């Protein structure tokens, strides 16, 4: 009888240990190999309203981007898919132009820690149709837009550091897919990182994306009650 009780006790302890063990983390989904369609974008955007970007290196901190899935479904869904698969992890901000923009998203920076001939030319292997800014959207300070090169626009994006509406509209079309709503001070710190040449903007100290988390949480509520 004693041995039976001991076996029962061992089995109970094992069962409790199994129940208390942390479940294995869910592996990230595979990264996309082609641009999203409007149909596929809808499913991707169902629970994607906010992107929280954590950076390390010369600047430590995080900032959050309110995503404009309704206004720019293709660009937003593509960004969300790349963020969820871990594409941006390890990529650094390769273009820092004070008073203009900070830009990131070139996967080539994962294997380089300084300037090289193809810096700023990398992408995920595909591009997609540029979506003109929706009515009411402007290239305001802290607006977030995709690059407009047909290769780079697959993954590269930038944050405006000033009112660039007139400047960028005269230069071309850049899809606005979000706006920084939390962590503006982190953006300002990145913009202040020393660079090789103020006209080129390659940083002398790296600011690297550690992760981007996508959530359904809306941005902070403004003083007038709007979000």
PLM feature segments, named:
Residues 8-17:
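Bacterial N-terminal signal peptides
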Residues 1-8, 144:
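Bacterial N-terminal signal peptides that target proteins for export
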Residues 19-227:
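Cyclophilin-like peptidyl-prolyl cis-trans isomerases
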């Amino acid at each position: 009888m004693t041995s039976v009780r001991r076996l029962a006790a061992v089995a109970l302890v094992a069962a409790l240990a199994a129940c208390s063990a942390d479940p294995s983390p869910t592996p990230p989904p595979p990264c996309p190999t082609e641009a999203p369609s409007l149909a596929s974008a809808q499913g991707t955007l169902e629970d994607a309203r906010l992107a929280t970007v954590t950076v390390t290196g010369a600047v430590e901190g995080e900032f959050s981007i309110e995503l404009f899935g309704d206004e720019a479904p293709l660009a937003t869904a593509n960004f969300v898919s790349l963020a969820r698969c871990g594409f941006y992890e390890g990529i650094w901000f390769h273009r820092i132009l004070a008073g203009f923009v900070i830009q990131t998203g070139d996967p080539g920076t994962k294997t380089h820690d300084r300037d090289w001939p193809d810096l700023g030319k990398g992408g995920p292997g595909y591009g997609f149709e540029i979506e003109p800014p929706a009515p009411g959207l402007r290239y305001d300070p802290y607006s977030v837009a995709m690059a407009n090169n047909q290769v780079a626009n697959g993954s590269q994006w930038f944050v405006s550091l000033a009112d660039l509406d007139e400047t960028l509209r005269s230069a071309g079309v850049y899809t606005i897919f979000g706006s920084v709503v939390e962590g503006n001070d982190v953006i300002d710190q990145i913009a202040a990182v020393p660079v090789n040449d103020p006209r080129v903007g390659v940083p002398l100290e790296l600011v690297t994306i550690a992760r981007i988390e996508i959530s359904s949480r809306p941005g902070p509520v403004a003083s007038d009650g709007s979000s």
